[in-house]
Amino acid sequence: MLNNYLKVMVVSCLLICKSSSAFILGIGIHPGNNGLSAQDYLKYAQEYGFNSVRTDFFWSRIENRQGIFNDSDYLRTQDYIFSNSISSLGKSALLVLDYGNRIYTPKGYPENQSEISAYVNYASRTAKRYKGKVLYYEIWNEWLQGTGVSKKNKPTADPKIYTELVKQTYKAIKAVDPNAIIMIGSINPNSPSYIKWLNRLINEGILDYCDAISIHTYFAHDAPLVSKTPEGAVSNIDKLEKMLKERSGRDIDLYITEMGYSQTEKDVYSTSDMILQNVAKFMFLAKSRPFIKGIWWYDLINDGDDRTNKEHNFGFLYYDKTPKKTARYIQSISSYMMDDSIMFSSQIIDDKVIVTARNKTTQVSKKFEWVPYGSITESELDSYVNSLSSLTDH
């Protein structure tokens, strides 16, 4: 019996160690929204080249009685996803610890010590349940903008509250699983208000209680228009990384835990071709930054079939599960993005963005270029992706 236990522990350790290396090319999922089984989510993610999934672990849905996780279809679905992500996709899922629970947090978020303690207990029980299965945790989601909370009870912008929540939750998870990689913030580098808030969090010492910063790089209402472009968005990520290094005196890993483009009929700038080139550019530029350890795109499948509803149309697959051009693109390039033997870099030379993929051993390289903020065609992308096979030929 002991030998079997040790074997399980060794296998779990090896899987987690393997899962923690290499670039994450992940995708967000919404179990329960699309009529899919847990197996289907992992199947579609695998089919289209993703090596991780990101999903909420809603506190309100897993604990209806104090201290007891519900025996429910929701929890069984999550159990399957978190238990099988590494074996199915190659890397651990990212588990988002969110949001409030009416038993403990009447306003939908923790605002005092007793409510923070209840959230910490939920996080600790979650870490115990998935130790050896889940490596990545995100503490809350988009606190500053109040996602998941009613508009009348938007969480306070007081940095002390979120910092204290992070501090206590970080310590509790690490006590259970020292190997866990814990992300915080959901910071939008394009948003001046988010950067201001992050600086206030840093003043409170929050960087001592995280392993990485999670970032969401959507276009923000208070951002300049250039940040709508991949070039502009990644430039803002560069500025964020520089600021973090200056404030902390050390390197801090960044994980893009949400990024996406909604393909709606009423927006002439969100055609399938436009989104394809934006996804491709963003992928190339993000992979060229060594401090960006991964990206979870938002999201796997459209959340509805109303082509005029922005929130329905972020999927890489349509609501009927047929693939968009972006899904086919990820499918074609994912193996190169995840290959540790291939290094991507980018630079601007003679008013052109030049991305270089290079085999670290053979030094064989392939370049792709475009005019900053200019268009690239599907055929140009296909040609470049096809050329990358020469980097892995032996």
Segments (PLM) and residue ranges:
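Boundary/entry segment of secreted carbohydrate-active catalytic domains
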Residues: 21-58
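Conserved, mostly hydrophobic/aromatic
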Residues: 53, 126, 137, 169, ...
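Aromatic- and carboxylate-lined catalytic core of secreted/periplasmic carbohydrate-active enzymes
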Residues: 283-370, 374-377, 384-393
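Substrate-binding cleft and catalytic face of glycoside hydrolase catalytic domains
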Residues: 45-69, 74-196, 202, 206-208, ...
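Extracellular serine-dependent O-acyl
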Residues: 135-140, 182, 252-257, 288-306
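Sec-dependent signal peptide recognition
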Residues: 3-11
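N-terminal signal peptide c-region/cleavage motif recognized by signal peptidases
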Residues: 16-19
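Noncatalytic carbohydrate-binding groove/subsite architecture in carbohydrate-active enzymes
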Residues: 159-282
